[in-house]
Structure formats: C-alpha cells, structure tokens
C-alpha cells in the first residue's frame, strides 16, 4: 500500500527495538538497493578480511568492505607480541594490492586517540578530521583517507 506523505500522520505504527536478523537485513538491503538504483548508483557491497598467520597462529587481521567507489577498513588488529614488526603495514599493503586497478577512489578508516593514529599516517593516510570526545580525549575519533592512483 503506497502512502502519500500528507497521509503519513494518519498511519498507525509502533517502533520497537529488535535483533538485526535476516528479515530486517533483507528489508534494509532491498530498500537501499532500490533507492541507489533510482539514483543511478550501484553499491556492490563486498566484505573482505585478510589474516596474517605464523606457525598456524593468527597474528593479525584486517577486515572491512568495499562499496560504491570506496574501501572501508573496519578493523585492523595485530597481536601485541608482533606489533612493530611490519605486520600491520603488510596487511594495509595487501588491502591496497587486492583492490588495485578496480576503479576504487580511496581507502577510509577511523581510529581512536588511544589507538594507532601514527601508524595510519606512516602508511600514507591523510587525517581528514577529528571528532572530539568531550569527556575522554582517548576516545577522540580520527578519520583517515588514502587516495588510490
């Protein structure tokens, strides 16, 4: 049933907190895809994960997703005893190499003040902006971008 905006105030509805199950995810994806298509955009959401191992032990991982024309790094973790040994840098390079030549514009990531801001800058990321946490500066969010050739 189509609802005109002028009739919306007459629609009875309830809003509840629910688990994000497959039914809700399917609804969200379907509606987003329709809206994107109506605007001539293709999302192509594709999650990724690369894992570093040593002697069958996971020592690092990077995960995220590519969609629209961007790559988003959600998580980058290196086991504490292996930090500072180039593993994180190699994981970033692996992401770059995996998406090289596929038409992506940039890689985005976000980190907190207590995390690895210097690391991302060392890897060639530029700081776009900082979202300040007024109660705890360690939780300031640093938003980084790296443009691809």
Describe the predicted segments one by one.
Residues 99-112:
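Conserved GNAT acetyl-CoA-binding A-motif
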């Amino acid at each position: 049933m189509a609802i005109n905006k002028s009739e919306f105030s007459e629609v009875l509805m309830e809003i509840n907190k629910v688990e994000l199950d497959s039914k809700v995810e399917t609804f969200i994806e379907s509606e987003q895809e329709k809206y994107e298509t109506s605007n001539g955009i293709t999302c192509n959401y594709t999650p990724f994960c690369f894992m570093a191992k040593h002697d069958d032990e996971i020592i690092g991982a990077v995960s995220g997703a590519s969609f629209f024309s961007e790559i988003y790094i959600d998580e980058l973790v290196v086991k504490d005893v292996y930090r500072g040994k180039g593993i994180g840098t190699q994981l970033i390079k692996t992401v770059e190499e995996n998406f090289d030549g596929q038409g992506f514009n940039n890689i985005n990531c976000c980190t907190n003040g207590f995390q690895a801001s210097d690391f991302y800058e060392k890897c060639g990321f530029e700081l776009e902006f900082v979202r300040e946490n007024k109660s705890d500066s360690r939780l300031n969010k640093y938003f980084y971008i790296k443009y691809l050739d």
